[in-house]
UniProtKB/Swiss-Prot annotation:
Entry similarity comment: Belongs to the G-protein coupled receptor 1 family. Adrenergic receptor subfamily. ADRA1D sub-subfamily.
Region (Disordered): 13-44, 50-69, 444-472
Residues where lipid is bound covalently (S-palmitoyl cysteine): C413
Function, in words: This alpha-adrenergic receptor mediates its effect through the influx of extracellular calcium.
Bilayer disposition of the protein: Multi-pass membrane protein
Gene: Adra1d
Organism classification: Eukaryota, Metazoa, Chordata, Craniata, Vertebrata
Membrane side Extracellular: residue ranges: 1-90, 154-163, 233-245, 368-374
Residue ranges crossing the lipid bilayer per the database entry: 91-115, 128-153, 164-186, 208-232, 246-269, 343-367, 375-399
Sugar-bearing residue positions: N60, N76
Keyword Secreted among UniProt keywords: no
Post-translational modifications: Palmitoylated. Palmitoylation by ZDHHC21 may increase the expression of the receptor and regulate downstream signaling.
Subunit structure and binding partners: Interacts with FLNA (via filamin repeat 21); increases PKA-mediated phosphorylation of FLNA.
Name this protein carries in UniProt: Alpha-1D adrenergic receptor
Length: 562
């Protein structure tokens, strides 16, 4: 019997007394009166959702009410929708699932539109997050509505063929979502562990190849039941469920969950270890790259007269070293152990909580049918995995301030990013400065230069030239940069990240306010952060030509991506 037959009542034959079908707990297929119509019923599995047929004979005046009462003991408090009797509990479940689905769709759409409408968010890491959002959006829009319909009605009304397709798409989207989480964990480990080489390691072409491989693996896992790797088809077309064939249940559980879970746990544990060691190195003022003899020293150049109140060079040197270490920690904020532990607990904990119960029960129930949970418990476990697709947009993108700002702009219908002046907190206080100070990242030889003076091995970027004036060095824009009407700090295709601007702004406020007492021995009272440079020792090599790097791609110059 098709879904259309369930929603319709068939009338046949002339007027005469008729008998009713569908009595009892769901009824049977109905019977035909001597001269009356056939009455459609619903199998006993549908319980109180039976449809009562009526005739037109004299004996049928009270048959409708009697048969309806016999067909369902819960008719009172139920709603009839399209000829189907839906209980009040089913209506409540439907409303809850509808809100759940709409939340998942809206959250994943926000992630996709945020990256599409903001060029500064179009990075390789965010491409993986967008892929996660696409998988979750496809699951929310193409799978969950039919799953919710089956939960409300109590049976599958869409036929056997569509059931097989729905189950395959379900496995495809869930597997792609989990593999996307796995890919994000690997990408963030590479970004933290080898961040100086990250732009060369994780290019857009490699990212596209990884995403193509990800969907190929998900497709291989999902097409098994369509090719016959499943248990025998049940005779009742109104039943639709996941395949519990032993071999496929184990294969899909291992490929879709257990292997990705192992990778996720290992990668995030490594991220935490590397972040903690990096934080300790930054507190000491030196960051050592593994397997290399060179040292990377973060130094904050302060504009102004670097004179001590007492004129003691030794005291000035010691206090300057302390200031350098504290500023390094405040600038980078790479990985505070408590924050990293909290973030990792949320990421790994939510993933395991949502998916582990389902992938534990599925193979266990296939191997040992007597250990299967009850139907109600299995439904909760089944939808708990879907819940992960709803919370992913909250965990991963919302851990970034840039994504939060992009969400707010989208909600305010401000798709285009406003042109804001870079680092307004670093506006030069002296009239001799024509432009704002530049943030330069230059590899330098091992010897040190006096603070406040430019390195002899570094040249300014095109479009900016230095001149002496007032208490320090300023920047005077060239004619070409004025014609462009936009001061490009990092080149036409590179923009400083929001996190880095906020960090430098915080440092500037420290110099001017509460930290002035500690900073007065190293910087003038009105000094500001002029540059962040990398001191890289070169053994026997010539001076390194100044190169500009993307701050967001440099090791430890962005907040931890965990």
């Amino acid at each position: 019997m098709t879904f259309r037959d369930i929603l319709s009542v068939t009338f046949e034959g002339p007027r005469a007394s008729s008998s009713t079908g569908g009595s009892g707990a769901g009824g049977g297929a109905g019977t035909v009166g001597p001269e009356g119509p056939a009455v459609g019923g619903v199998p006993g599995a549908t319980g109180g959702s039976a449809v009562v047929g009526t005739g037109s004979g004299e004996d049928n005046q009270s048959s409708t009410a009697e048969a309806g009462a016999a067909a369902s003991g819960e008719v009172n408090g139920s709603a009839a929708v399209g000829g189907l009797v839906v209980s009040a509990q089913g209506v409540g479940v439907g409303v809850f699932l509808a809100a759940f689905i709409l939340t998942a769709v809206a959250g994943n759409l926000l992630v996709i539109l945020s990256v599409a409408c903001n060029r500064h968010l179009q990075t390789v890491t965010n491409y993986f997050i967008v892929n996660l959002a696409v998988a979750d959006l496809l699951l929310s829009a193409a799978v969950l509505p039919f799953s919710a319909t089956m939960e409300v009605l109590g049976f599958w009304p869409f036929g056997r063929t569509f059931c097989d397709v729905w189950a395959a798409v379900d496995v495809l989207c869930c597997t792609a979502s989990i593999l996307s989480l796995c890919t994000i964990s690997v990408d963030r480990y590479v970004g933290v562990r080898h961040s100086l080489k990250y732009p060369a390691i994780m290019t857009e072409r490699k990212a596209a190849a990884i995403l193509a491989l990800l969907w190929a693996v998900a497709l291989v896992v999902s097409v098994g039941p369509l090719l016959g790797w499943k248990e025998p088809v049940p005779p009742d077309e109104r039943f639709c469920g996941i395949t519990e064939e032993v071999g496929y249940a184990i294969f899909s559980s291992v490929c879709s969950f257990y292997l990705p879970m192992a990778v996720i746990v290992v990668m995030y544990c490594r991220v935490y270890v590397v972040a903690r060691s990096t934080t300790r190195s930054l507190e000491a003022g030196i960051k050592r790259e593994p397997g290399k003899a060179s040292e990377v020293v973060l130094r904050i150049h302060c504009r102004g007269a670097a004179t001590s109140a007492k004129g003691n060079p030794g005291t000035q040197s010691s206090k300057g070293h302390t200031l350098r270490s504290s500023l390094s920690v405040r600038l980078l904020k790479f990985s505070r152990e408590k924050k990293a532990a909290k973030t990792l607990a949320i990421v790994v904990g939510v993933f395991v909580l949502c998916w582990f119960p389902f992938f534990f029960v599925l193979p266990l129930g296939s191997l040992f049918p007597q250990l299967k949970p009850s139907e109600g418990v299995f439904k909760v476990i089944f939808w708990l995995g879907y819940f992960n697709s709803c919370v992913n947009p909250l965990i991963y993108p919302c851990s970034s301030r840039e994504f939060k700002r992009a969400f707010l702009r989208l909600l305010r219908c401000q798709c285009r990013r406003r042109r804001r002046r870079l680092w307004p907190s670093l506006r030069p206080p002296l009239a001799s400065l024509d432009r704002r100070p530049a943030l330069r990242l230059c590899p330098q030889p091992a010897h040190r230069t006096p603070r406040g003076s430019p390195s002899p091995h570094c040249t300014p970027r095109p479009g900016l030239r230095r001149h002496a004036g007032g208490a320090g060095f300023g920047l005077r824009p060239s004619k070409a940069s004025l014609r462009l009407r936009e001061w490009r700090l990092l080149g036409p295709l590179q923009r400083p990240t929001t996190q880095l601007r906020a960090k430098v702004s915080s440092l500037s406020h420290k110099f001017r306010s509460g930290g002035a007492r500690r900073a007065e021995t190293a910087c003038a009272l009105r000094s500001e952060v002029e540059a962040v440079s990398l001191n890289v020792p070169q053994d026997g090599a010539e001076a390194v030509i100044c190169q500009a790097y993307e701050p967001g791609d440099l090791s430890n110059l962005r907040e931890t991506d965990i």
